[in-house]
Amino acid sequence: MMGGNMSKMMKQVQKMQQDMLRLQEELGNRTVESTAGGGAVKVVANGRNEIVSIEIKPEALDPEDVEMLQDMILAAVNEALKKAQDMISQEMGRLTGNLKIPGLF
């Protein structure tokens, strides 16, 4: 009886691993975006926590205030990465039934 349960559990673990790999690939194709400065800076990140694009509108370019542009870029990047991490956590939670598995994501 114990062997049957162990076999069933191992199959479930293997299925979860396959599902996780599929989800990781899928998340790499999904994106989130964030803006700063009223849309002057837009950053897009994917579900691998990678920044895939940064757009800066011409009106954001002020040679007299480079620091403001740097702050807007930093704010938009950080927010995009946070949104990407939230998306990853939400999707992984669905997959694992909200189990907290250390080091998983």
UniProtKB/Swiss-Prot annotation:
Tagged with keyword DNA-binding? yes
Coiled coil stretches, renumbered = none
Q: Which UniProt keywords apply?
A: Cytoplasm, DNA-binding
Q: Would you say which domain of life the source belongs to?
A: Bacteria
Molecular-function GO terms, alphabetical:
DNA binding
Subcellular location(s): the record lists: Cytoplasm, Nucleoid
Q: Which InterPro entries match?
A: YbaB-like_sf (IPR036894), YbaB/EbfC (IPR004401)
Name the GO cellular-component terms: bacterial nucleoid; cytosol
Q: Which cysteines are joined by disulfide bonds?
A: none
Q: What does this protein do?
A: Binds to DNA and alters its conformation. May be involved in regulation of gene expression, nucleoid organization and DNA protection.
Subunit text? Homodimer.
Protein's UniProt name: Nucleoid-associated protein PTH_0052
